[in-house]
């Protein structure tokens, strides 16, 4: 039997070993790493809210309710802040009700495995987040994965598979490693045509996309056609946790059936209060300004990369991949950039398929245009030196 140490050594030999880096201070557009200031190009803190004064103040207010929630909400009771946050999320997403989970992973595994089971069918985009796939496996429903954004292939599966059980179509709204957006209009149409529920994981769209930051569904004009809006509180909203926003019936069903909700101590008061403040801020004039600043930063950065000849893999959002290919070249690219003061992660298997390794750049509203221009120039220099462009 291969030992754990041998497996780790094999990962090192393949260039797939992972380790953590310690940063000092708060998450921001610049952080201190290994004793020097570096530009953060790998955070999902898209609007810069993780260190926003209003969220900090709200978290301090939340501590007045204690630092922990005691137990599962079904055991020790729901705190007022839980209800206030869920009411605010439901209003934000335009649904009857919402239910808060402890993380995006907990939400997806809990929602998917609760809504379907043996004899049911799940139709999932091949590039969906790992938590969706894990939820599908936990559900024991039949899992049918269609090629990325291929609606003709999905329709063939819907025609041929599923039997008489429940059908669930599930997709990322924004795909986390590619930065492209799901064809939600077509997904809504197919869900209605074939009697399926449609669930959209909008972790990377919430707070960022659409005229008022409601996400990819708002951007594409199909908010009402989505049955389950899943999203996170820890990316564009800068806090922590996740949610399902849906009909009252579905949310009540999840309270009774979603094991990741039932068997977990709930989010603490400081996080709940900060999350409420985040949604209020996204809905404010400042939120609009931040989205506009983010959009301008994204356009600038992509323009500079395109001029340098990089392949950004069809990104439509603030997630900007730079295609490299081999894992070793990708990690060398990341290493040299860090030496040059740019913190950006190389993405390797199992996160992406072998041969499709990339740098995953993420842009923030709080980046300064001059910083992004300088970063793009350094990326171009290093990319040419390494033969990527």
Swiss-Prot record:
PROSITE patterns: AA_TRANSFER_CLASS_2. Substrate binds at residues 18, 129, 351. The modification N6-(pyridoxal phosphate)lysine is found at residue 235. GO terms for biological process: biotin biosynthetic process. Homodimer. Belongs to the class-II pyridoxal-phosphate-dependent aminotransferase family. BioF subfamily. HAMAP family: BioF_aminotrans_2 (MF_01693). Catalyzes the decarboxylative condensation of pimeloyl-[acyl-carrier protein] and L-alanine to produce 8-amino-7-oxononanoate (AON), [acyl-carrier protein], and carbon dioxide. This is 8-amino-7-oxononanoate synthase. The gene is bioF.
């Amino acid at each position: 039997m291969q030992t754990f140490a041998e497996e780790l050594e094999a990962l090192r030999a393949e260039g797939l070993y992972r380790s953590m880096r310690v940063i000092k201070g708060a998450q921001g557009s610049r952080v201190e790493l290994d004793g020097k200031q570096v530009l953060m190009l790998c955070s999902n803190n898209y609007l810069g809210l993780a260190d926003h004064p209003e969220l900090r103040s709200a978290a301090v207010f939340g501590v007045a309710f204690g630092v922990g929630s005691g137990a599962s909400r079904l055991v020790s009771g729901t705190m007022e802040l839980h209800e206030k946050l869920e009411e605010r999320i439901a209003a934000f997403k335009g649904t009857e009700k919402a239910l808060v989970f402890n993380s995006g992973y907990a939400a997806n595994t809990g929602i998917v495995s609760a809504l379907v089971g043996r004899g049911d069918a799940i139709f999932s985009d091949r590039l969906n987040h790992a938590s969706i796939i894990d939820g599908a496996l936990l559900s024991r429903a039949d899992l049918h994965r269609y090629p990325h954004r291929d609606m003709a292939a999905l329709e063939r599966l819907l025609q041929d598979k599923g039997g008489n059980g429940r059908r669930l179509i599930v997709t990322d709204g924004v795909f986390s490693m590619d930065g492209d957006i799901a064809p939600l209009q077509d997904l809504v149409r197919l869900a209605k045509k074939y009697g399926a529920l449609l669930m959209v994981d909008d972790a990377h769209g919430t707070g960022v996309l659409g005229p008022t930051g409601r996400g990819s569904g708002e951007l594409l004009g199909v908010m009402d056609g989505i049955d389950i809006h899943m999203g996170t509180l820890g990316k564009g909203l800068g806090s922590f946790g996740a949610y399902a926003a849906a009909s009252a019936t579905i949310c009540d069903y999840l309270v009774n059936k979603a094991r990741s909700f039932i068997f977990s101590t709930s989010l603490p008061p400081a996080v709940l209060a900060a999350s409420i403040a985040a949604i209020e801020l996204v809905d404010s004039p400042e939120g609009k300004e931040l989205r506009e600043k983010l959009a301008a930063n994204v356009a600038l950065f992509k323009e500079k990369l395109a001029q340098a000849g990089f392949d950004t893999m069809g990104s439509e959002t603030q997630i900007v991949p730079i295609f490299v290919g081999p894992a070793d070249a990708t990690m060398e690219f990341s290493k040299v950039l860090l030496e040059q003061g740019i913190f950006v992660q190389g993405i390797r298997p199992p996160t992406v398929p072998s041969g499709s390794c990339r740098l995953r750049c993420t842009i923030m509203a709080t980046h300064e245009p001059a910083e992004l221009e300088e970063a793009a120039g350094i990326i171009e220099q290093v990319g040419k030196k390494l033969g990527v462009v």
